């Protein structure tokens, strides 16, 4: 799933922490920098520019208020993709965890600037797991169909997401 996980993480952060809290921690502005850049964090503002860059996605992972954030994330992915068999790829997760030094740097910088509420290693564990979920193009097409239909599954007619979150 890698970076597509960022969209699910944002949805879950909005559902569990609310709009105001989530966007007090991460902005909504585009950036012309690389997805893993920290340049703007130091130059412009203490908040990541948006939830679709690594710094922003780490923050949205921290904004998920649940006893088991990754389990909540996985349940949401399964629901929105209409596939109860979606799961974590343990090898990808271990690789992300082992090689995620830049993301570690970002998380500790965010913690030092009081953007992260949680402990960096705990937040990163959730983030690395999110990025390591395996799904198919068909799964993601179903998810896109729900987003394009303002949160309603057109196959079942069931509202799966509030329209204002979409």
Which residue ranges define each predicted feature?
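Short N-terminal secondary-structure initiator segments
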Residues: 6, 66, 158-159
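Active/ligand-binding-proximal structured segments within catalytic/core domains
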Residues: 2-11
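Short pre-catalytic segments that frame enzyme active sites
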Residues: 1-2, 17
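Active-site-proximal alpha-helical segments within enzyme catalytic domains
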Residues: 134-152
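A penicillin-recognizing enzyme superfamily signal
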Residues: 133, 153-166
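Electropositive phosphate-/nucleotide-binding environments in soluble metabolic enzymes
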Residues: 54, 100, 134-137, 163
